[in-house]
């Protein structure tokens, strides 16, 4: 394979991540085209130039920013997906509704069954809107460098992901990403309710929308202390220059479409928020 060749990533998010990583590193960069075949890959993984592989220590800790020269999304490829894969991908679409485009939330609330049908016009609309959200954010902050302090650039796309990645690692990746992200969004909403004044209505709506499309809103069999240790590897964390201690940063929302960063929340508050999204 030469620099004049092209890698084609044809498959789900893991496939496009690996294909992109190979393209970024082989001969210091060759072209790559993605043809995503899952909802999650179309709405998120294949778009935006993030590539990477998972290692035992955590998710996406080895990777690179590397844009494909093209992405082809053909929803006909989704018709053979198991229902679980469709639901998992919808989590990323819901996320885009909370961080940027509340119309997505309204469409899902109005007809959850239509959204679960990948041949429906409603599904195509929410997918298209989610792609537009992701592309819009990435176009101004490809390398995730505009977030500073409480300001949020591309990191807004990680809403719910801090806890989600910890759950995935602890569960040895037996949970789909969207399933973990659904619980992560409930957790992020609880934090937002506590620190950013997110309303009771939106907090409740988070659970209602996610559970309405068959996604989990609680997580069992996991101890907070175990997840908390894994979170120290989160890519949004920073080291406090005065104390040398790693400080966690969470993406939160004041309301749908209005994002803010929650920096160094109280440890007791984190545990309490997780308790509210733990299975009983």
Task: Please describe what each predicted stretch is.
Residues 1-2, 25-27, 54-55, 62-66, ...:
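Solvent-exposed alpha-helices and their adjacent loops that cap or buttress functional pockets
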Residues 115-226:
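Active-site segments that bind and position negatively charged phosphate/pyrophosphate groups
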Residues 90-94, 108, 126-134, 185, ...:
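Short alpha-helical scaffolding segments that buttress acidic/His motifs in well-ordered protein cores
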Residues 85, 91-93, 197-280:
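C-terminal charged capping/lid subdomain of soluble metabolic enzymes
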Residues 1-33:
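N-terminal small/polar loop signature for handling phosphorylated ligands or for N-terminal nucleophile
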Residues 20-114:
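A glycine/threonine-rich phosphate-anchoring loop and its flanking beta-alpha core
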């Amino acid at each position: 394979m030469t620099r004049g060749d092209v890698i084609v990533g044809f498959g789900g998010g893991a496939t496009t991540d690996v294909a992109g990583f190979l393209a970024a590193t082989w001969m210091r960069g060759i072209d790559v085209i993605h043809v995503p075949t899952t909802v999650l890959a179309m709405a998120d993984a294949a778009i935006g130039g993030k590539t990477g592989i998972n290692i035992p220590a955590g998710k996406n800790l080895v990777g690179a920013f590397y844009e494909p020269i093209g992405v082809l999304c053909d929803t006909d490829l989704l018709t053979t997906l198991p229902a679980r894969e469709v639901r998992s991908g919808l989590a990323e679409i819901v996320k885009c509704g909370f961080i940027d485009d509340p119309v997505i939330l309204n469409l899902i609330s109005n007809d959850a069954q239509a959204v679960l049908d990948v041949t429906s016009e409603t599904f195509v609309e929410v997918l298209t809107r989610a792609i537009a959200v992701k592309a819009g954010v990435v176009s101004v902050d490809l390398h995730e460098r505009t977030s500073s302090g409480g300001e949020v650039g591309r990191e807004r796309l990680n809403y719910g992901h801090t806890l989600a990645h910890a759950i995935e690692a602890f569960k040895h990746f037996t949970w789909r990403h969207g399933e973990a992200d659904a619980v992560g969004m409930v957790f992020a909403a609880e934090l937002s309710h506590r620190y950013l004044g997110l309303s009771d209505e939106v907090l409740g709506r988070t659970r209602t929308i996610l559970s309405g499309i068959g996604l989990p809103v609680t997580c069992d069999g996991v101890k907070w202390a175990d997840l908390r240790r894994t979170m120290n590897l989160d890519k949004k964390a920073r080291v406090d220059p005065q104390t040398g201690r790693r400080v966690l940063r969470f993406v939160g929302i004041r309301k749908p479409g209005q994002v803010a960063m929650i920096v160094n929340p109280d440890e007791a508050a984190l545990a309490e928020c997780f308790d509210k999204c733990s299975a009983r």
